[in-house]
């Protein structure tokens, strides 16, 4: 997620008679500077719009229109493109696009001031997590707006009137969930389990997922809290929210919540596990890559498998620090007995042919036979959930392989074999398998929750489904951001349409005219799709440069601090001012 591109704008001109009052009016006494009336290329406009305006203690400096309203448009378009790009094709309908666009227009001016853009960055990071989980536009919109709602920058009435009742309902439910742990006097296993079941039974499942994304963002930025609060929050997440993430099928999110909680609750133990796993990963990386290549080639070369499978992918598997700790400490295993240090997952996509319904299981078993011919299978360790699925419907074939060589002992390699459909069922939002990891061991309870989740998803899909007649204009438009700005559907963005979005963002008509002048290459007074796409390309370039700058800054800060602490360099703040600080 590009965080640098979401840095809040400086004071923004509000001229043009805004359609809505915003909570952050222009500071009195500051007047915007005008750009020279020169014909500038699109990259100059994007650079002016996307880069952060310089700030100083002097009250005489203010933002240019391109640095104000134009920059907000760049943020709006960039964020919109990223979120719709993360959503699946089936989710990014034109109805969904309109909803996301409205949510971003409401959130951007509400979050642009106050803390250097951190609130806006958090809101967009949460929205990106929800998009990665393939949630619908209502949930993603609620994720965008929750930060502004918590800060008091918008009200629930604003959400209802400008976004919709369904999104407001999700926000209301997530706020109730936020305070659910306060109902517990003691956070023991029994109480935590009861609270998890209560949350899954009495709250909107999509609001639960929204709250999980919020907790993940909180855990990623826990360093800013006092030590005792870090531990309290981490214990709460480990006992309640990480198992909830398993229960709703968000397995990767659950793993990250567990590992972050482990890191703050038991930092020394976490460091030991992390260093050991990193050493194992470094030592075995070339080995794993070699095994993946060998296996993939063997599967592709098999004639029998090629007849029933159209695609094969082999993935590595993330090594959970928390799970590894439990195996070593709770289960009492020795390091050499931790068998998923070397781990692969084979995902097969059977050919689409209704004449044979058993091609998926056949492909899994044929893959198993090929693996047996390549390596030594460990007797008694194979688990065939393809032929005999678990009660909750989980299907996969698990194999343990001995890859040791004479004089060179290695950990066992675990390989999971499943079809694409089985994989979706196992790790997606429809997987009852995850409900067991979430503490719901009753199959009937798991099936009931699955039915609730599917019903909620179907209801949202019906609301956001495109209507052929009303959405015909949008369906013919390939650039979703352009469609949202081209209100009348004539294939061009007029100055009136650009002014309208500027006013929605808290800027004004002067900013719109300035941005139009910068982007309108043929001077016809409007923006064509080609001119707008050139602007979009430059926005993405600026966002990627900001991302790289942020990464380089962190690397250099760490390296220069190390050098400075060793006494190898001395930097005088008085000489360099704020240009280079090594502390």
Curated annotation (Swiss-Prot):
Domain HD: 119-219
Known EC number: 2.7.6.5
A Gene Ontology biological process term: guanosine tetraphosphate metabolic process
Chain positions covered by the region annotation Disordered: 1-68
Subcellular location: Plastid, Chloroplast
Catalysis: reaction(s): GTP + ATP = guanosine 3'-diphosphate 5'-triphosphate + AMP
Record-listed Ca(2+) 2 binding positions: 520, 522, 524, 526, 531
PROSITE patterns membership: EF_HAND_1, EF_HAND_2, HD
EF-hand domain ranges (all copies): 473-508, 510-542
Protein name per its UniProtKB record: GTP diphosphokinase CRSH1, chloroplastic
Regulation: Activated by calcium.
Range of the transit peptide: 1-69
Positions bound to Ca(2+) 1: 486, 488, 490, 492, 497
Pfam short name (any one): RelA_SpoT
UniProt domain comment: The calcium-binding sites of the 2 EF-hand domains are required for enzyme activity.
Function: Possesses calcium-dependent ppGpp (guanosine 3'-diphosphate 5'-diphosphate) synthetase activity in vitro and is able to functionally complement E.coli relA mutants. May be involved in a rapid plant ppGpp-mediated response to pathogens and other stresses.
Biased composition (Low complexity): 1-13, 40-66
GO CC annotations on file: chloroplast
Tissue specificity comment: Expressed in roots and shoots.
Family: Belongs to the RelA/SpoT family.
UniProt-recorded Gene Ontology molecular function terms: ATP binding; calcium ion binding; GTP binding; GTP diphosphokinase activity; kinase activity
CDD domains: EFh, NT_Rel-Spo_like
PANTHER family in alphabetical order: GTP DIPHOSPHOKINASE CRSH, CHLOROPLASTIC-RELATED, GUANOSINE-3',5'-BIS DIPHOSPHATE 3'-PYROPHOSPHOHYDROLASE
Keyword set, alphabetical order: ATP-binding, Calcium, Chloroplast, GTP-binding, Kinase, Metal-binding, Nucleotide-binding, Plastid, Repeat, Stress response, Transferase, Transit peptide
Biased composition (Basic residues): 19-39
């Amino acid at each position: 997620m590009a965080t640098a591109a979401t840095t809040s704008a400086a004071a923004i001109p509000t001229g043009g008679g805004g359609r809505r009052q915003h909570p952050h009016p222009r500071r009195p006494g500051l007047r915007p500077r005008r750009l020279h009336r020169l014909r500038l290329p699109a990259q100059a406009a994007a650079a002016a719009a996307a880069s952060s305006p310089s700030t100083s203690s002097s009250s005489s400096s203010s933002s240019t229109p391109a640095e104000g309203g134009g920059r907000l448009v760049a943020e709006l378009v960039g964020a919109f493109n990223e979120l719709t790009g993360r959503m699946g094709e089936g989710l990014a309908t034109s109805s969904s696009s309109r909803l996301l666009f409205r949510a971003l227009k409401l959130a951007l001016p509400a979050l642009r001031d106050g803390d250097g853009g951190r609130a806006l960055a958090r809101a967009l990071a949460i929205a990106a997590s929800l998009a990665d989980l393939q949630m619908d536009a209502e949930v993603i919109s609620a994720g965008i707006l929750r930060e502004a709602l918590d800060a008091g920058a918008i009200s629930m009435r604003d959400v209802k009137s400008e976004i919709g009742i369904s999104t407001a309902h999700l926000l209301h439910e997530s706020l109730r969930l936020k305070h659910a742990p306060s109902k517990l006097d003691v956070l023991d296993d029994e109480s935590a389990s009861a609270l998890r079941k209560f949350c899954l039974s009495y709250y909107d499942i999509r609001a639960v997922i929204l709250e999980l994304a919020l907790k993940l963002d909180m855990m990623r930025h826990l360093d800013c809290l006092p030590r005792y609060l870090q531990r309290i929050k981490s214990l709460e997440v480990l006992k309640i929210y990480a198992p909830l993430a398993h229960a709703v099928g968000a397995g990767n999110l659950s793993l990250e919540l567990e590992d972050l909680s482990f890191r703050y609750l038991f930092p020394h133990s976490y460091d030991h596990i992390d260093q050991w796993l990193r050493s194992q990963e470094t030592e075995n990386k070339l080995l794993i890559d070699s095994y993946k290549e060998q296996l993939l080639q063997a599967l592709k070369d098999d004639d029998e498998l090629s007849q029933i499978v159209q695609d094969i992918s082999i993935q590595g598997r993330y090594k959970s620090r928390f799970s590894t700790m439990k195996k070593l400490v709770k289960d009492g295993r020795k390091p050499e007995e931790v068998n998923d240090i070397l781990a692969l997952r084979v995902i097969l996509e059977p050919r689409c042919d209704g004449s044979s319904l058993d091609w998926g299981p056949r492909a899994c078993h044929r893959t198993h036979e090929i693996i047996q011919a390549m390596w030594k299978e460990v007797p008694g360790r194979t688990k065939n959930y393809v032929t005999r699925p678990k009660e909750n419907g989980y299907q996969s074939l698990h194999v343990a392989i001995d890859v040791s060589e004479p004089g060179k002992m290695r950990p066992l390699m675990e390989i999971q074999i499943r079809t694409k459909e089985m994989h979706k069922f196992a790790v997606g939002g429809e997987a009852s398998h995850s409900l067991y990891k979430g503490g719901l061991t009753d199959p009937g309870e798991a099936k009931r929750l699955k039915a609730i989740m599917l019903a909620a998803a179907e209801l949202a899909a019906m609301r956001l489904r495109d209507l052929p007649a009303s959405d015909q204009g949008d369906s013919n438009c390939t650039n979703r951001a352009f469609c949202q700005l081209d209100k009348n559907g004539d294939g061009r963005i007029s100055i009136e349409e650009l002014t309208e979005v500027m006013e929605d963002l808290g800027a004004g008509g002067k900013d719109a005219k300035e941005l139009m002048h910068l982007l309108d290459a043929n001077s016809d007074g409007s923006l064509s799709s080609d001119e707008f796409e050139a602007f979009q390309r430059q926005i993405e370039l600026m966002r990627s440069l900001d991302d790289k700058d942020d990464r380089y800054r962190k690397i250099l800060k760490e390296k220069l601090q190390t050098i400075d602490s060793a006494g190898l360099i001395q930097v005088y703040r008085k000489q360099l001012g704020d240009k280079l600080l090594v502390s």
